[in-house]
C-alpha cells in the first residue's frame, strides 16, 4: 500500500545498479487501493525499461500471518501439533497458496542464479548488488548474503554482534536458536523455537537453487511466518542445518535497536530512511502508528529523477 515508497526505492536501485537487474517481482498483498494500477501504468514501465516488471496480487490478504501450504509441514509440526491443528492445511479461511508467501513468487519464477530481496523503504546510495555478487563468487557454498541481525530481539545482544558472528563466535551451543529475554541463559530454545538470528531481508541476496533446496529438504519457505520467528528467521536456521554458508559483507558492532544507525551499511543503502520501519505505518512497533508521507516521496521522485508520479492514480 505504499507504491510511492517502493517506486522510489527501485529508482535509487536503478541509479546505482541498473545494469545488473533484469526483472522485478512485485507481490501485492490485496491492497485494493490503486497500487497495482500504478505499477502497471505505462509511464512507470517506460521509466524502468528495460527492466521487466512482474506484478502479482495475492489470492488473499496474508499480512503477517502464516501460510499453510499442503505438503510442507516443518519439523515442529509433529503428531501432537497435527492432532489439533491439521485443519489449518485445508481450512478455506487460512491462506494456502505458496505464491502468497513473501518472495516466493519471485523464487519460483526467476530463471536467474541470484535473487536480490528488498523492502520498500530502502534508499540505495552505492552498488550493493556487485558487493553481494562478489561474495557469492568467492564462496560456492554461500546461500545468502546481507544485513545480519535482529539483535534487538535477542538476550545475547550484550555479548554478541553481527561482527562477532562473522568472525566465528557463537553465543551458545544452541545457536542459531536464541532464548528470549525472559528465559534463563541455559534454556534450550529448541523447546520454544525462539529465533532472532537471521539475514535481514530488507536488503539481501540469495542463491536461488540453494534457497529452493532448503525449502524442499526442510519443508519451509524463506518468507513464511513460522512459530516464534520473524520473516526469514526460521528458514535461516534450517539453512544453517543444511550446511550452507551465510555472510554479512558489512557487519556492524551491534544492533541494539531496529533503527540503529549503521555506518557500515549506510555507505551502500539506508534502511527506513523515512525515519520509521515500513510496517509502522499500520502497526505500533514501539513508536506508535506513524504517518506515511506520500507527498514527500512524490516530490523526491520529481526532484531526484525527474519522474512525474501518476497523480490521477493516488488516493
List each model region and its residues.
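Active-site beta-to-alpha loop of glycosyltransferases that engages the nucleotide-sugar donor
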Residues: 1-8, 30
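Short, acidic, metal-binding catalytic loop of nucleotide-sugar glycosyltransferases
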Residues: 11-21
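Short beta-strand/loop segment that forms part of the nucleotide-sugar
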Residues: 21-31, 56-60
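Active-site-proximal specificity loops/subdomain of glycosyltransferases
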Residues: 41-109
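Short aromatic/hydrophobic "clamp" motif used to bind/position activated sugar donors
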Residues: 115
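The conserved acidic donor/metal-binding loop of glycosyltransferases
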Residues: 119-123
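Conserved catalytic core of nucleotide-sugar-dependent glycosyltransferases
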Residues: 125-222
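C-terminal catalytic/acceptor-binding lobe
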Residues: 220-315
Amino acid at each position: 500500500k505504499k507504491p510511492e515508497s517502493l517506486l522510489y526505492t527501485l529508482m535509487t536501485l536503478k541509479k546505482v545498479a541498473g545494469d545488473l537487474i533484469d526483472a522485478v517481482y512485485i507481490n501485492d498483498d490485496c491492497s485494493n487501493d490503486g497500487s497495482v494500477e500504478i505499477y502497471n501504468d505505462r509511464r512507470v514501465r517506460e521509466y524502468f525499461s528495460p527492466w521487466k516488471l512482474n506484478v502479482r496480487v495475492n489470492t488473499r490478504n496474508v499480512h503477517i500471518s502464516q501460510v499453510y501450504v499442503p505438503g510442507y509441514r516443518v519439523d515442529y509440526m509433529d503428531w501432537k501439533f497435527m492432532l489439533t491443528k491439521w485443519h489449518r492445511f485445508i481450512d478455506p479461511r487460512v491462506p494456502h497458496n505458496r505464491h502468497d508467501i513473501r518472495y516466493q513468487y519471485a523464487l519460483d519464477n526467476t530463471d536467474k542464479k541470484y535473487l536480490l530481496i528488498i523492502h520498500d523503504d530502502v534508499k540505495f546510495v552505492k552498488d550493493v548488488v556487485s558487493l553481494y555478487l562478489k561474495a557469492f563468487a568467492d564462496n560456492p557454498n554461500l546461500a545468502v548474503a546481507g544485513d545480519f541481525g535482529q539483535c534487538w530481539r535477542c538476550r545475547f545482544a550484550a555479548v554478541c554482534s553481527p561482527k562477532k558472528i562473522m568472525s566465528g563466535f557463537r553465543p551458545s551451543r544452541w545457536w542459531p536458536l536464541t532464548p528470549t529475554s525472559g528465559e534463563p541463559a541455559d534454556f534450550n530454545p529448541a523447546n520454544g523455537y525462539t529465533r532472532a538470528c537471521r539475514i535481514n531481508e530488507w536488503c539481501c541476496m540469495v542463491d536461488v537453487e540453494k534457497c529452493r533446496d532448503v525449502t524442499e529438504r526442510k519443508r519451509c519457505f524463506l518468507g513464511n511466518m513460522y512459530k516464534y520467528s520473524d520473516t526469514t528467521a526460521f528458514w535461516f536456521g534450517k539453512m544453517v542445518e543444511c550446511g550452507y554458508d551465510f555472510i554479512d559483507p558489512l557487519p556492524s558492532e551491534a544492533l541494539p535497536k531496529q533503527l540503529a544507525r549503521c555506518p557500515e551499511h549506510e555507505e551502500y543503502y539506508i534502511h527506513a530512511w523515512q525515519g520509521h520501519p515500513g510496517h509502522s505505518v499500520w502497526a505500533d512497533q514501539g513508536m506508535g502508528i506513524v504517518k506515511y508521507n506520500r507527498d514527500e516521496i512524490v516530490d523526491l521522485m520529481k526532484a531526484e529523477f525527474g519522474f512525474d508520479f501518476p497523480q490521477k492514480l493516488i488516493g
